[in-house]
């Protein structure tokens, strides 16, 4: 049986939300309008934490930030974003957890609702070879259209995308001893689908579910979220 270690990114391995931080970063650089995107970004984060935003609206809003420039123009931005914003927010406890699973010869997979363009450098930085993320639509010139593509990797979609990823390798979840680390009630479907769910820095709703179901709770940074 394959040992699978699945990791959500935002508020789990990362102390923060990479979508929200990306918007803030682009606003600070003058790429996005502070009045428009700043308010919408803050509201989207609140709605996501409450579990009240639709998967389509959430993913579409953040992917839309990539429509402002040609794809090649984003490379310098995302490299700076990784170095200046993301890497400092991934603490030693998260890195030690990843290393422990490597030492156990587990197959490491990052699964995130955030789009691939933003998160693939983070996965590489952490030495996670496999990434399941929301995909971005490209036009004929290979530039971002500002729309997500295919099945969104959020809520039930995380289960479906994982199953599809496993099927490409001739596997099913039944073939795996799977552990999944997540902070969010939005990931309840995948947490319930694996053998070893771990509520990690859980939001209030997930903490309540974890207590009810007897799931372990792990703190990787700070004292955990309360909203």
Residue ranges and their predicted role:
Residues 1-50:
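Active-site neighborhood of HAD-like aspartate-dependent phosphohydrolases
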Residues 2, 76, 83-227:
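C-terminal cap/substrate-recognition subdomain and adjoining C-terminal extension
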Residues 17, 69, 157:
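Conserved active-site and cofactor/substrate-binding residues in soluble primary-metabolism enzymes
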Residues 18-25, 71, 135, 152:
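Active-site phosphate-binding/coordination module
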Residues 19-22, 58-59, 141-147:
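Acidic/polar active-site rim loop that often engages polyanionic ligands
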Residues 50, 62-66, 140-141:
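Active-site phosphate/ATP/adenylate-binding loop shared across adenylate-forming ligases
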Residues 57-92:
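Metal-dependent phosphoesterase signature
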């Amino acid at each position: 049986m394959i040992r699978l270690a699945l990791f959500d990114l935002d508020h789990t391995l990362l102390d923060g939300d990479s979508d929200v931080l990306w918007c803030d970063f682009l606003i600070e650089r003058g790429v996005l309008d502070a009045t428009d995107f700043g308010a919408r970004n803050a509201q989207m984060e609140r709605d996501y934490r409450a579990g009240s935003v639709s998967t389509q609206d959430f993913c579409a809003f953040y992917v839309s930030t990539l429509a402002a420039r040609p794809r090649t123009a984003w490379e310098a931005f995302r490299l700076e974003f990784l170095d200046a914003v993301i890497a400092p927010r991934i603490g030693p406890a998260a890195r030690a957890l990843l290393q422990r699973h490597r030492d156990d010869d587990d197959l490491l997979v990052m699964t995130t609702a955030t789009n691939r363009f933003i998160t693939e450098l983070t996965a590489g930085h952490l030495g996670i070879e496999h990434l399941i993320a929301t995909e971005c639509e490209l036009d004929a010139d290979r530039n971002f259209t500002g729309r997500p593509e295919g099945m969104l990797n959020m809520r039930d979609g995380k289960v479906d995308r994982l199953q599809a990823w496993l099927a490409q390798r001739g596997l099913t979840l039944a073939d795996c001893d799977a552990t999944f680390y997540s902070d969010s009630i939005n990931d309840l479907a995948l947490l319930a689908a694996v053998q070893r769910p771990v509520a990690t820095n859980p939001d209030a709703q997930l903490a309540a579910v974890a207590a009810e179901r007897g799931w372990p709770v792990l703190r990787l940074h700070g004292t955990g979220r309360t909203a």
